[in-house]
Amino acid sequence: MAKVQYFGTGRRKKSVARVRLVAGDGKVIINNRDIENYFPIETLRVIVNQPLVLTETKDKYDVLVNVHGGGFTGQAGAVRHGISRALVKADENMKSSLKKAGFLTRDPRMKERKKYGLKKARRSPQFSKR
């Protein structure tokens, strides 16, 4: 009999995470590396584990993630979004608590584009009176 897997795709800023949940003992593997090695900052690991802690499924599933694009924070948010979506596919009853916590909502905030005549998105060149 094949192992039951649940898939979820998460996005945040420029990052895209493809998440697989497999029945297991709570290991989180990101890009073939352990979560402690991939996210050295504790707050990022907390962000990734939030949906599992909220639904009390930390020890039920192994989480296998493939994530690319963006930086650390964007990738952590994308992984959290993907795990939440996969948990909903695994158990529909978790949807209300995850939605209430805001983990199923795609964060729409993106980097604002640079405009011509300006140094950055909103920063204008230095003004000289004389």
Curated annotation (Swiss-Prot):
Location of the region described as Disordered in the Swiss-Prot/TrEMBL record: 102-130
Protein name: Small ribosomal subunit protein uS9
Keywords: Ribonucleoprotein, Ribosomal protein
Family: Belongs to the universal ribosomal protein uS9 family.
GO CC terms of this entry: cytosolic small ribosomal subunit
NCBIfam families for this protein: PRK00132.1
One BP term from GO: translation
One Pfam family matching this protein: Ribosomal_S9
GO terms of molecular function: RNA binding; structural constituent of ribosome
Biased composition (Basic residues): 111-130
